Structures are given as C-alpha cells and as structure tokens.
C-alpha cells in the first residue's frame, strides 16, 4: 500500500521535480525473478515504485545523423490530410530546422538531426525544452509555445525547413510557408508512427524512419512476449491539480501498450475520447468517489505539472485511492509525464516500453 510517508516525500519533492509525481527515494531496489538482468529499474519507496531512475536522457538522441535517401537536392514531401498544398518542395539536407510540435522534436532526435534544429516551440506551460531528450535538445532556443508559436522569432532564425502540426496550429500554415518550406504532420498522439514517417520524408530520411519503426515494433513484441504482457491489464492514469484522468485506447501511451501487447481493463477500452476525468479536489475526495475505472493489475501514474505533483500526495493517500487493488498489491508505478504523455514520439515510446518491463513484476 502507498503509505503516508511516501506521499509526504512526494509533496516535498514536487517543487524540484517537474515531470514526475516523485523524485528519488532511499528504499531498496525492486527486482523480479523473471527479469534477473534488469538493473534497478524501480526504486521501492514505501511500497510504490518510481520508474525511470536508470534512464539516461543524454543517450536519447542518435549520435549521428541518419543517412539521407538517395536523390536530388530538393524533394517532395506530403502535408497531413486537410492541409493545402498537398505536396511541398523541401531541401534534401535541411540545415536550419524550426520544429513546432513535440512529437516532431522527438522524431528529429531519433533520426540524429537534433543539431540542425535552430529553434523549437516550447511545451505549453514550460520554460524549457523536454528534459527526457537530454542536453542535445535542452539548449535549443524557444520560439513561442506549441499552441502559440512566435512567427517573428521563427523568421529571425532563417530556417530552411519548418515542421508544424495540423493538430496544434492548423491556421498558421500560410504564414509559416511564407517564411520557409513548411511540412505539417497530423495531430500528435496515437498516430505518432505516421508522424515519424512524415518527418522522415520531410528530411529525406524515409528509409531511416521505417528502419527505426521496424526496430521499435520488434523490440515491443519481444518485451511483450518476455513479460507475458497479454495476460496483464494495465491502467494509464494522469493526475492534474484537480482531476484524475483515466486514459482509453485512442492516445499515445495506449498505442505503445498495444504494440507491446498489454491488455487494458474493460473500463478503459473506450475510443471516442483520449481520457475520462474524475474530480479529485478535497471536496470530491471527501465524497468517496468510485475510482474503479482507474484500477487494473498494474497502474502507471504520471503528473501533468509540478502543481499536480504536489497535489498527488493528497490524491494517492485518499480513501478512494487506497481501495484500488493494484494499490494494495504494490503495483502502482510513478512514471515520467514527458515520456508517457507529452513526448509522443519514438524516443518516448521506447521509454514506455522500458517501463512496461515491470508489468509482470511479482506482487510485493
């Protein structure tokens, strides 16, 4: 059971930890008899596991740029459906890329093109680039936010390629295309693999993108088979300052669980929206709400913001939460929100697969 001591530690660490519900702990490492080669992926803190402590963000981006597809100095790339024009002429070797969506930044990192990014829109509500992509991405200058990019700032960077998102800034395409060749991919989320292919095509690295995705698919299948994933149901939960979000199957993390073969509880098999929300204010929790929609064999919990991380102590120590069977069995894991929710690309997906190695960990 997640105990009050752990939850107080969460609250104390929230101010310093921006993307997870907890920081480091002093508990013993958890190990699994079925995964003897696994090196302390989980630190046990009063019964709750914090995943990703062994992750190395500086190893996230490919060290070298992927090889370009053979062909002329300029190529044709397709925009996402609904964007005019359908086809854009782009340089085969762009050197000054401006990227406006997190999944595209992740894709460029996976392709080893991070050094060519001269600016990137910042995540909404953040003053810095995503930490999970490491120091290769952290110093990249911001140009507004993903929902409100700074057009003047973009123009000042003199880009030779702009990558944008139909799902984030659909009305800005004409203005962006007036600055430099611009390719829009689809809304970030469940379609992340197609968006990676779109970034690959826009940077003349379609073959490299396909190879990366084939490698991911093989590894996801291998992890699923090794850890008997299909016989376990996993829950995806995100805490905000006043809500508990329970995710369905039409979103980024659910697509990764699907690739691994992890089952989902019946209450989370909806597809008409990314998630449902349950009130989690003090007043809501005092009414003893039914949180069974969040329950499963294992629950993966992330926090949407530092304020949500600070609030997590109250939510996870509430009577309604304590009733969940996964909580009783010490099968609640705290995960990185950048990796599970906002990354929405191959590097983030690899991180989720790493966390899913605990899906069949023994009940403690």
Specify the residue positions occupied by each region the protein language model found.
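Bacterial Sec-exported substrate-binding components of ABC uptake systems
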Residues: 2-16, 20-103, 208-237, 308-311, ...
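Alpha-helical, coiled-coil/dimerization segments enriched in small aliphatic residues
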Residues: 248-282
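Proline-aspartate-enriched helix->loop->beta-strand connector
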Residues: 151-163, 181, 291, 295-299
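Short helix-initiation/N-cap motifs at beta->coil->alpha
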Residues: 83-85, 143-151, 278-286
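Structured C-terminal subdomain patch of bacterial secreted/periplasmic proteins
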Residues: 295-364
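Ligand-binding pocket segment of bilobal, Venus flytrap-like solute-binding proteins
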Residues: 73, 274-308
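A short, structured surface patch at a secondary-structure boundary
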Residues: 69-71, 96, 100-153
């Amino acid at each position: 059971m997640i105990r009050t001591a752990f939850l107080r530690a969460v609250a104390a660490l929230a101010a310093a930890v921006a993307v997870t519900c907890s920081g480091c702990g002093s508990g013993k490492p958890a190990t699994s008899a079925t995964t003897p080669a696994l090196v302390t992926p989980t630190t046990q803190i009063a019964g709750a596991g914090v995943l990703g402590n062994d992750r190395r963000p500086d190893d996230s981006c490919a060290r070298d740029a992927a090889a370009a597809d053979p062909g002329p100095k300029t190529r044709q790339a397709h925009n996402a459906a609904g964007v005019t024009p359908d086809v854009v002429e782009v340089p085969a070797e762009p050197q000054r890329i401006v990227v406006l969506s997190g999944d595209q930044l992740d894709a460029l990192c996976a392709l080893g093109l991070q050094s060519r990014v001269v600016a990137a829109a910042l995540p909404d509500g953040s003053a810095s680039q995503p930490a999970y992509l490491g120091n290769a991405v952290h110093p990249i200058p911001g140009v507004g936010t993903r929902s409100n990019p700074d057009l003047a700032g973009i123009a000042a960077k003199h880009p030779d390629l702009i990558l944008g998102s139909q799902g984030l800034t659909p009305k800005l395409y004409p203005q962006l295309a007036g600055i430099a060749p611009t390719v829009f991919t689809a809304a970030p989320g469940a379609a992340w693999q197609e968006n990676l292919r779109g970034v690959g095509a826009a940077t003349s690295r379609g073959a490299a993108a396909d190879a990366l995705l084939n490698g991911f698919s093989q590894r996801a299948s291998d992890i699923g088979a090794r850890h008997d994933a299909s016989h376990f149901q996993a829950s995806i939960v995100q805490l905000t300052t006043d809500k508990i979000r329970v995710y369905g199957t039409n979103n980024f993390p659910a697509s990764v669980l699907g690739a691994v073969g992890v089952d989902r509880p019946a209450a989370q098999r909806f597809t008409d929206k990314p998630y449902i929300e349950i009130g989690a204010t003090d007043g809501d929790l005092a009414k003893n709400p039914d949180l069974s929609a969040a329950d499963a064999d294992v629950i993966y919990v992330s926090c949407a913001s530092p304020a949500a991380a600070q609030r997590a102590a109250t939510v996870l120590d509430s009577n309604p939460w304590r009733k969940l069977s996964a909580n009783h069995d010490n099968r609640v894991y705290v995960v990185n929100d950048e990796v599970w929710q906002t990354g929405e690309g191959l590097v983030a997906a690899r991180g989720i697969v790493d966390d899913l190695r605990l899906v069949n960990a023994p009940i403690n």
